[in-house]
């Protein structure tokens, strides 16, 4: 769909209901960090003696806190293993995410257009806030958000 059509669709929604703010998730909404996420999972699982599941199985856990994703993939609920997995994942993926994560087509234009319309924008994610900010800065859109909130900024990143 051409950018103009996407903006027209958004413009209709924004003018029909005067939104004051829009909250975006990052993964698969604004951007895609799949290569670094897959690398982090592969490394973390390998370090704990688990085979890496296929990429689609890992993708289905994106958006959950890492410890929960680990348990979904392995069945292991041991809190020590879950914390170790987080540390291994972060070691392998964090630096790569800034470089490898990309914005989805039209995301930058949409964020700028919403800003021109006076709509405040926030991005919320289970990613660590510093990782998320690094990605947004590297992609040149950090200034498009009034609020950046990572999973480490809250006590329960996926409340019921």
Q: Predicted regions: what is each one?
A:
Residues 1-24:
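Non-catalytic pre-domain segments flanking phosphatase-related domains
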Residues 3-5, 9-10, 39, 105, ...:
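Feature targets compositionally biased, intrinsically disordered low-complexity regions
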Residues 3-4, 9, 52-54, 80, ...:
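Generic low-complexity segments that are intrinsically disordered, proline-rich and/or Lys/Arg-biased
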Residues 17-108, 112-117, 138:
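N-terminal helical cap/lid subdomain that shapes the substrate entry/recognition surface
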Residues 100, 128-160:
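Substrate-recognition "cap/lid" segment bordering the active-site pocket of phosphatases
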């Amino acid at each position: 769909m051409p950018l103009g059509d996407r903006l027209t669709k958004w413009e209709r929604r924004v003018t029909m209901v005067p939104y004051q703010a829009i909250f975006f998730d990052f993964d698969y909404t604004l951007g895609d960090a799949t290569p670094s996420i897959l690398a982090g999972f592969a490394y973390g699982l390998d370090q704990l003696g688990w085979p890496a599941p296929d990429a689609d199985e890992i993708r289905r856990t994106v958006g959950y806190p890492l410890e929960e994703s680990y348990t979904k993939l392995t069945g292991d609920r041991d809190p020590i293993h879950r914390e170790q997995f987080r540390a291994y994942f972060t070691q392998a993926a964090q630096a790569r995410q800034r470089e490898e994560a990309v914005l989805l087509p039209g995301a930058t234009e949409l964020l700028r257009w919403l800003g021109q319309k006076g709509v405040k924008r926030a991005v919320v994610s289970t990613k660590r806030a510093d990782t998320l900010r690094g990605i947004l800065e590297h992609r040149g859109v950090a200034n498009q958000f009034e609020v950046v909130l990572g999973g480490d900024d809250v006590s329960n990143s996926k409340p019921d």
